[in-house]
């Protein structure tokens, strides 16, 4: 069994405080998986431009620790006995189409104060400056909306407080605190930019930049699963690797790195998103078959064994394969079948025969079953930079040969 790494603000493996309540359940679920369960695992496919509300499997949120959950900069929450449906009375500014949207109205309800973050006052959203547009993704506990804040396009994530379950509400509050604390302290060109957050009695709200290009998975789907041009694929892979090198350098783990959570900016650069709250559904509802995350998940996470930052490296290997091939990983399997094949038969995606050797080497090292064999992201960045140089050099040589083959002309 692997020993979880010791991080300043992160507990890993089976030591998550939030894992204890459902550990037995997940073990039973894995037992069924190990017996060859053929449950449907189709993803919700709710990729978005500011995060994701798709569900995943082993997802105590990024940076989970008592120190982070109990951060002194986070206000205690007052509890109200109202539901979202009961709260809507005097809305703030929403589009006409959202008049019947209870979550949006609950956020804008002026009868209740906006609760922000002490010591993080600059991150507390001023709802007077927030204009909400249509929802573009949703899950069991919330929705994602496009909107504007101070005139800037933003993605607005709203999570609903469970009405009749204090335990679920407490857990979701912890997840909200963790994601806000993470995003407020992560500043990198390849990390989705955090704009602010707030609470209302019935909802939590997180606002991030809006990535107009959608997710990498949506991009590949629009291309009808055709491979991304190699130069662009390597550039985007480098964006992800650099962002993750930064995240790991801050002693955090993402835990749900996949193409759904990689957002494309207007300049085609990649932004890593989804650092916590979007993955609350599994722990609040128990292990669920409605997830596609198994396709990217490291075997030690699938088996609920102790893990460390190398789970993100494994997932990156799968993402790199996606960019190179344009295909959905294990597309001929359900996600549960893929998980079974990965863990019990060592199956991995097939590397194309014409794949650049350096890229093939990166993929296979990243998704090695042994986490100790997987490179760190700092090394991955160096390897991809070498691949990028090789691709550019080859292209220049090809252009030079083309020029030599053309007859000389005199003007």
UniProtKB/Swiss-Prot annotation:
GO biological process: protein phosphorylation; regulation of embryonic development; seed oilbody biogenesis
Result of changing residue 165 to A: No effect on kinase activity
InterPro entries: Kinase-like_dom_sf, Prot_kinase_dom, Ser-Thr/Tyr_kinase_cat_dom, Ser/Thr_kinase_AS, Ser_Thr_protein_kinase
Molecular function per GO: ATP binding; protein serine kinase activity; protein serine/threonine kinase activity; protein serine/threonine/tyrosine kinase activity; protein tyrosine kinase activity
Record annotation: effect of changing residue 269 to A: Loss of kinase activity
Binding site for ATP: 136-144, 157
Outcome recorded upon mutating residue 259 to A: Loss of kinase activity
Catalysis: reaction(s): L-seryl-[protein] + ATP = O-phospho-L-seryl-[protein] + ADP + H(+); L-threonyl-[protein] + ATP = O-phospho-L-threonyl-[protein] + ADP + H(+)
Any Pfam family hit: PK_Tyr_Ser-Thr
KW Signal (keyword) present: no
Family matches, as Gene3D superfamilies: Phosphorylase Kinase, domain 1, Transferase(Phosphotransferase) domain 1
Posttranslational mods: Autophosphorylated.
TM stretches of this protein: none
Family designation: Belongs to the protein kinase superfamily. Ser/Thr protein kinase family.
Protein name per Swiss-Prot or TrEMBL: Serine/threonine-protein kinase STY13
Organism of derivation: Arabidopsis thaliana
Gene: STY13
